[in-house]
């Protein structure tokens, strides 16, 4: 099936692009002195010392990504990733419908998947825009929370749909990777639920930052597993 090869190609780029962009922004912030006196001089907020935020949580993703010149990398990368996400969910919807031969052309994972991509686009556009108003601050939190919730729901529903039809596609899939995808989704859900009390409090900044970095990697790691899950179909 051509759609499987398409899904594989899209999946690997959905993993690579945000991971590379995110860590490039981190490297720019950590090595800000390299850009002193150039047109790419890092803004004051973006200047930080050596840190491994995945472990120490010293800095947030937003701080490394929202200042010049990091946002020149981060914003286009996230918007392009969102476009790929839309294509990914549409391709998966077509594949599941084809395998099942169903009349219902729209799966719920498609709605949540496309929704998560739209939230990501909105988050990328408004990142770094300063507007001191409570409603705007609420909107930003709502957008990032919407992306996370919609993305996790979409991933969960897709895994459920694939699990239901796995016997029909056993020659095209890697069942061990399917198990890993199920485990990953469960971990993401449990982590989100356990983290709610911490995220709703005003304390634990380093914990929140470290969780943010690692959770982001966990979310996009799903797409690396998607690439490995489908076996390449020879045309």
Can you annotate each of these PLM segments?
Residues 18-38:
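Alpha-helical transmembrane segments of multi-pass membrane proteins
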Residues 84-115:
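Cytoplasmic juxtamembrane regions at transmembrane-helix boundaries
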Residues 97, 125-133, 193-204:
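Juxtamembrane "helix-exit" motif on the non-cytosolic side of transmembrane helices
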Residues 116-172:
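Membrane-proximal helix-loop-helix units in multi-pass membrane proteins
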Residues 157-235:
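Terminal transmembrane helical module of multi-pass membrane proteins
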Residues 55-80:
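Interfacial helix-start motif at the membrane-water boundary
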Residues 2-22, 107, 173-182:
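Alpha-helical transmembrane segments and their helix-start/interface "positive-inside/aromatic belt" motifs
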């Amino acid at each position: 099936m051509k759609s499987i090869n398409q899904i594989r190609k899209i999946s690997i780029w959905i993993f690579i692009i945000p991971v590379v962009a995110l860590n490039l922004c981190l490297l720019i912030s950590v090595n800000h002195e390299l850009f002193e006196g150039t047109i790419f001089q890092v803004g004051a907020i973006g200047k930080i010392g050596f840190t491994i935020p995945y472990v120490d949580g010293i800095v947030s993703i937003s701080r490394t990504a929202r200042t010049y010149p990091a946002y020149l990398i981060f914003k286009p990368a996230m918007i392009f990733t969102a476009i790929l996400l839309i294509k990914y969910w549409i391709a998966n919807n077509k594949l599941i419908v084809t395998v099942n031969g169903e009349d219902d052309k729209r799966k719920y994972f498609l709605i949540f998947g496309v929704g998560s991509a739209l939230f990501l686009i909105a988050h990328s556009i408004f990142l770094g825009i300063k507007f001191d108003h409570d409603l705007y601050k609420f909107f930003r939190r709502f957008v990032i929370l919407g992306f996370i919730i919609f993305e996790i729901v979409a991933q969960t529903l897709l895994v459920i749909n694939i699990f239901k039809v796995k016997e029909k596609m056993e020659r095209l899939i890697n069942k061990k990777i399917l198990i890993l995808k199920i485990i990953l989704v469960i971990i993401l859900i449990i982590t989100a639920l356990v983290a709610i009390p911490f995220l709703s409090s005003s304390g634990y900044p380093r914990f929140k930052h470290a969780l943010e970095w690692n959770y982001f990697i966990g979310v996009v790691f799903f797409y690396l597993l998607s690439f490995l899950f489908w076996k390449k179909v020879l045309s």
